[in-house]
Amino acid sequence: VITITNVSYDPTREFYESYNTMFEEYYKKTYNKEVQVIQSHGGSGSQARSVVEGCNADVVTLALEHDISLIEKTGLVDAGWIKEFPKSSAPYTSTIVLLVRKGNPKQIHDWDDLTRKGVDVITPDPKSSGGACWNFLAALGYAKTKWSDENKQKEFMRRLYHNVSVMDSGARGATTTFVENGKGDVLIAWENEAIATMKSYGGKYEIVNPSVSILAQPSVAIVDDNAKANGSEEVSKRYLDFLYTKQAQRLIGKSGYRPTDKEILQEFGNEFDLSIKLWTIDDFGGWEKAYQKCFDDDAMFDEIYNY
């Protein structure tokens, strides 16, 4: 049996559980070899750091390109990884939405409602969670749409984050805080987490699609050094390639992620609000720049959160 390890971010557990079974069956049928995939999940930034520190991942499927770039800087992932797989190595996308309790008691309709007095917001910590970085940028995109003055944008972000009562280390922890522990009035969430919550707890929650959000592009890569050492390069490549097949893209849609295959995305037209205006990471100058400006030590997040 060939074993490979996929180090992934927080809310992808259920998707990869199903996908791994699908891939293992396909591999057995096509190559007549047994393969077993081991999963690891947590906040994307923490997961990237664990690979840098020696966690033996063959592949990484993380929340944002920046997390894989961190691993690339150590030489574990080959330069140019982003061109190795289609669509800039992003086999699925998502966006950021607001999840509220049934009946929307606090009347939350858009990002500015999250800055009102008495609104309790739940969102994870961008220092450890990739989803939290997308959450921050989605809100900042709204602020940029409203004001060109950076001080006004910062003031808006400061008011929003002043209302955050619990900041978990990962997106799944934030969902647990909101759903299981009943804390907060609104959860800033991955669209796929919000959809999954709606399916599991029918009738208890509502999704609010804000006027502006962000195209979240989780990235995938082979951890080349580890895969070479483990003799798993070929399986690792096929594992990530298989994400782009019609069969896998359909599973992606069923799991609440947006398939990058346009035809398959259309099949799920009712699941997703495709009318939300989506900023992209390029509107923020790409990840390197966005990370420096917003999430590095003493950058914008620290400035507005620790004031």
Predicted regions and their residues:
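Sec-exported extracytoplasmic/periplasmic mature domains
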Residues: 20-29, 52-56, 65, 72-76, ...
